[in-house]
Curated annotation (Swiss-Prot):
Keyword annotations from UniProtKB, A to Z: Cytoplasm, Elongation factor, GTP-binding, Nucleotide-binding, Protein biosynthesis
Compartments where found: Cytoplasm
Protein source organism: Actinobacillus pleuropneumoniae serotype 5b (strain L20)
Residues that bind GTP: 17-24, 88-92, 142-145
Chain ranges of the tr-type G domain: 8-290
Lineage, top ranks: Bacteria, Pseudomonadati, Pseudomonadota, Gammaproteobacteria, Pasteurellales
Described purpose of this protein according to its UniProt entry: Catalyzes the GTP-dependent ribosomal translocation step during translation elongation. During this step, the ribosome changes from the pre-translocational (PRE) to the post-translocational (POST) state as the newly formed A-site-bound peptidyl-tRNA and P-site-bound deacylated tRNA move to the P and E sites, respectively. Catalyzes the coordinated movement of the two tRNA molecules, the mRNA and conformational changes in the ribosome.
Presence of keyword Nucleotide-binding: yes
UniProt family annotation: Belongs to the TRAFAC class translation factor GTPase superfamily. Classic translation factor GTPase family. EF-G/EF-2 subfamily.
GO molecular function: GTP binding; GTPase activity; guanosine tetraphosphate binding; translation elongation factor activity
Alphabetical list of PROSITE patterns matching this protein: G_TR_1 (PS00301), G_TR_2 (PS51722)
Protein name: Elongation factor G
Presence of the UniProt keyword Lipid biosynthesis in the record: no
Length: 701
C-alpha cells in the first residue's frame, strides 16, 4: 500500500488543559467538524466520545488519554487534506504521568484555557512538562460565552504566569451572552459561524466599526512578532511596507516551531464557535513529524542513534499507553517514528529483548475502532494482543535495534494496604492489580513481607481511589483499604564487645548446648547492610556449626528488637564460644546466636531510621513563605530555592511520615497553583520523640 497522506500533512497534537477548561468538549467539536462524529457529545450529560471510561463520564474528568485520528482541509477547504491525530490528555494533577507520557509522543500541543478562570495551577504543571519536551504550542481560549469571560486577560496571563510569549491571532466579537464570533487579525475580517448547522459553515464580514482601532493595534503587535523571524522581514516592517498574509503565516510558523511564540485563538466550543479556526491554526502553525528533530535513541552497542520521520528508515515506534479493552483485551497505543509495519509482521521489543508479532492493528476514534493493515512513520495506532510490552518500550526492526529514550516515571509517593472482602475476591484481586500495574507504570503493587498484606502505591490519594474504583467496576473485586503506611528500619550507633549467648538444656536424655561470644558493630549506610565475620580459632566451635550462628542472627534481622522493623547496617564478629560433644547441634547454636544478638543490640545504642524524601515544590512567588513555613512544620530541611519571575523551586528533605495529605494541603495553601514531586532519598535517624511514639504504637499492637 502506498502512503495516502504525505507525512508533511500529518499533525500529531495533544489537547491539554486544566480541569474544566472545556478540553473534552473542544476535542468533541474537532471530531464533529472533521466529520468523524455525527452527534455532538456534551460532557454535561456524560456523553462525550473522548471520555470512554465509566468513571470519567461520572466524574466529568478525563483519565485515559485516548488517541483519535481525524482529517481536516480547512474552514474554507483552503488546504489539501491533512491528517490530525489528537491525543486527549488528562488535566488532573494525580494523572500528570499520563500527560507527561503523551507529551513524549506529540509533535505539538493546543493549550485550552477557560476565558473566565484563565491560567490555572494545573496549566502551570502541564506547561512545564511541555517545556521539558520542547513541544511547540498554540493556545485556545474557550468558554468566551460565559459570564466574566475576558480574552485579553488570559493572553496576558500566559505571559505573566507561564512565561510564554503569547500573541493574539484573533479578537472576540462581543463576550459572555453577546459572543458572536471572532476577528481574524491576519485577514482583518470578522468570522461569523452559522448557528443553524452547528457552525459547519461561516461567512467573512467586515469588522464592526467600534472594534477597528483595537484590531489594528493588535494586528500591529502580531505582525511585529512575525517580522522578528528574520532580518529581511524586520527591515520590511520598519520601513513601513505591508507584509503579505503568506509572509506573516510562514514567519509565525517558523517562530512557533522554534518555541518562541504562542499564537492564541478564542471561541466557545459549546456554542460551536472558534474551534474551526483553531483547527486551521493547528495546520498553519503546528509541526508535522518532519519539522521536529529526529528522535534520539541508544543503539545496541550503546552509541547514540536517531530515527528520522521517514518511511525509508528502519521501523521504530514507542509504546506510550497500555489500555484494557473489554472486548479485545490489551490495546497497546504506539507512535511510529520511522519505517513501515504491516499487520502480521514481527517486531522486536528492544527494551525487553523479545520478539512480538503484530497481529491486528487498529486506529482509534475515541472508543470506536477501525482495523488497518499497515502503519507508517508519523502514525499513531493501537496493536491488539501484544504479549509483553510495557509503557515506554521501543518496538523496532530486529535487524536495526534501537532503544528510544526511556520515559522517566516518578516514584509512587503514597502506599496503602488493600485486602479483599471475600475469599472469592482474593484471586481476582491479584489478577486485577497485575493488569492495572501493567497499564500504569506510576502504580506499583507488592506484598509486605512483615505483615503479608498487599500494598498498593501510587501518585496520590485520588490516583489510588480511582485504582480501587476500577478494581470494583472492571474486575468486580471488592476490597477494604487501610491507612497510608511508612516503612521504618532499625540500626545501632555504637560497638559492643564480648556479648555472650548461651543455650543449654539438660533435662534427662540428650540435652542441647550452644555457646557463642560476639562483637556487634555499626556499618556504613551505603554498604552491604549486614556482614558476618568468623574469627573462631582452635576449633572452640566446630566449623559445621558456624553457618547456624550466621543463620540465627540473620533471622533476628528480619524483625528488630526495637519495634519489629528490619535491622540494617550491622556487622557481627564471632570470636569465641564452646560446645559439647554430645549435646551441641545446629539448632542449639542458632538459638544461642539469636540470644547473643538480642542482648548486644539492646546495648549498642539502637535507633529507629525513617525514610527521608527529596521534595521539590514549584510555587508562584506569592506563596513561598506559606509553603516553607508548612514544610518546616513537617520537620523539613530546606536546602535552597531557585527563582525566576514566574515560579520559585524549593528543594527540601522531608520525612515521608510527615508528607501524608500534602497534595491536598499544598493545593489549599496556594489555591492549587503549586505542584510538587518527591522521590526516596535515604534513611535517617528519627528524633527520639518520634521514635518513642512509633515504638509505643507497635508495642500496643
Amino acid at each position: 500500500m502506498a502512503r495516502t497522506t504525505p507525512i508533511s500533512r500529518y499533525r500529531n497534537i495533544g489537547i491539554s488543559a486544566h480541569i474544566d477548561a472545556g478540553k473534552t468538549t473542544t476535542s468533541e467539536r474537532i471530531l464533529f467538524y472533521t466529520g468523524v462524529s455525527h452527534k455532538l457529545g456534551e460532557v454535561h450529560d456524560g456523553a462525550a466520545t473522548m471520555d470512554w471510561m465509566e468513571q470519567e463520564q461520572e466524574r466529568g474528568i478525563t483519565i485515559t488519554s485516548a488517541a483519535t485520528t481525524a482529517f481536516w482541509s480547512g474552514m474554507s477547504k483552503q488546504f489539501e487534506q491533512h491528517r490530525i491525530n489528537v491525543i486527549d490528555t488528562p488535566g488532573h494533577v494525580d494523572f500528570t504521568i499520563e500527560v507527561e507520557r503523551s507529551m513524549r509522543v506529540l509533535d505539538g500541543a493546543v493549550m485550552v484555557y477557560c476565558a473566565v478562570g484563565g491560567v490555572q495551577p494545573q496549566s502551570e504543571t502541564v506547561w512545564r512538562q511541555a517545556n521539558k519536551y520542547q513541544v511547540p504550542r498554540i493556545a485556545f481560549v474557550n468558554k468566551m460565552d460565559r459570564t466574566g469571560a475576558n480574552f485579553l486577560r488570559v493572553v496576558d496571563q500566559i505571559k505573566t504566569r507561564l512565561g510564554g510569549n503569547s500573541v493574539a491571532l484573533q479578537l472576540p466579537i462581543g463576550s459572555e451572552d453577546n459572543f458572536k464570533g471572532v476577528v481574524d487579525l491576519i485577514k482583518m475580517k470578522a468570522i461569523n459561524w452559522n448557528e443553524a448547522d452547528q457552525g459547519m459553515t461561516f461567512t467573512y464580514e467586515d469588522i464592526p466599526a467600534d472594534m477597528l482601532e483595537a484590531c489594528e493595534e493588535r494586528r500591529a503587535m502580531l505582525v511585529e512578532a512575525a517580522a522578528e523571524a528574520s532580518e529581511e522581514l524586520m527591515e520590511k516592517f520598519f520601513s513601513g511596507e505591508e507584509l503579505t498574509e503568506e509572509e506573516i503565516k510562514t514567519a509565525l510558523r517558523q517562530r512557533v516551531l522554534a518555541n518562541e511564540i504562542i499564537p492564541v485563538c478564542c471561541g466557545s466550543a459549546f456554542k460551536n464557535k472558534g474551534v474551526q479556526a483553531m483547527l486551521d491554526a493547528v495546520i498553519e502553525y503546528l509541526p508535522a513529524p518532519t519539522d521536529i528533530p529526529a528522535i534520539k535513541g541508544i543503539n545496541e552497542d550503546e552509541t547514540e542513534g536517531e530515527r528520522h520521520a521517514s518511511d525509508d528508515e528502519p521501523f521504530a515506534a514507542l509504546a506510550f499507553k497500555i489500555a484494557t479493552d473489554p472486548f479485545v483485551g490489551n490495546l497497546t497505543f504506539f507512535r511510529v517514528y520511522s519505517g513501515v509495519i504491516n499487520s502480521g509482521d514481527t517486531v522486536y521489543n528492544s527494551v525487553k529483548q523479545k520478539r512480538e508479532r503484530f497481529g491486528r492493528i487498529v486506529q482509534m476514534h475515541a472508543n470506536k475502532r477501525e482495523e488497518i493493515k499497515e502503519v507508517r512513520a508519523g502514525d499513531i495506532a493501537a496493536a491488539i494482543g501484544l504479549k509483553d510490552v510495557g509503557t515506554g518500550d521501543t518496538l523496532c526492526a530486529q535487524d536495526a535495534p534501537i532503544i528510544l529514550e526511556r520515559m522517566e516515571f516518578p516514584e509512587p509517593v503514597i502506599s496503602v494496604a488493600v485486602e479483599p472482602k471475600t475469599k472469592a475476591d482474593q484471586e481476582k484481586m491479584g489478577l486485577a492489580l497485575g493488569r492495572l500495574a501493567q497499564e500504569d507504570p506510576s502504580f506499583r503493587v507488592h506484598t509486605d513481607e512483615e505483615s503479608g498484606e498487599t500494598i498498593i502505591s501510587g501518585m496520590g490519594e485520588l490516583h489510588l481511589d480511582i485504582i480501587v474504583d476500577r478494581m470494583r467496576r472492571e474486575f468486580k473485586v471488592e476490597a477494604n483499604i487501610g491507612k497510608p503506611q511508612v516503612s521504618y528500619r532499625e540500626t545501632i550507633r555504637t560497638t559492643v564487645k564480648d556479648v555472650e549467648g548461651k543455650h543449654a538444656k539438660q533435662s534427662g536424655g540428650r540435652g542441647q548446648y550452644g555457646h557463642v561470644v560476639i562483637d556487634l558493630y555499626p556499618l556504613e549506610p551505603e554498604g552491604p547492610g549486614y556482614e558476618f565475620v568468623n574469627e573462631i580459632k582452635g576449633g572452640v566451635i566446630p566449623g559445621e556449626f558456624i553457618p547456624a550462628v550466621d543463620k540465627g542472627i540473620q533471622e533476628q534481622l528480619k524483625s528488630g528488637p526495637l519495634a519489629g522493623y528490619p535491622v540494617v547496617d550491622v556487622g557481627v564478629r564471632l570470636h569465641f564460644g564452646s560446645y559439647h560433644d554430645v549435646d551441641s547441634s545446629e539448632l542449639a547454636f542458632k538459638l544461642a546466636a539469636s540470644l547473643a544478638f538480642k542482648s548486644a543490640f539492646g546495648r549498642a545504642n539502637p535507633v529507629l531510621l525513617e525514610p527521608i524524601m527529596k521534595v521539590e515544590v514549584e510555587t508562584p512567588p506569592d506563596y513561598v513563605g506559606d509553603v516553607i513555613g508548612d514544610l518546616s512544620r513537617r520537620r523539613a530541611m530546606v536546602n535552597g530555592q531557585e527563582a525566576n519571575e514566574f515560579v520559585v523551586k524549593i528543594n527540601a528533605e522531608v520525612p515521608l511520615s510527615e508528607m501524608f495529605g500534602y497534595a491536598t494541603d499544598l493545593r489549599s495553601q496556594t489555591q492549587g497553583r503549586a505542584s510538587y514531586s518527591m522521590e526516596p532519598l535515604k534513611y535517617a535517624e528519627a528524633p527520639t520523640s518520634v521514635a518513642n511514639a512509633i515504638i509505643e504504637a507497635r508495642k500496643a499492637k
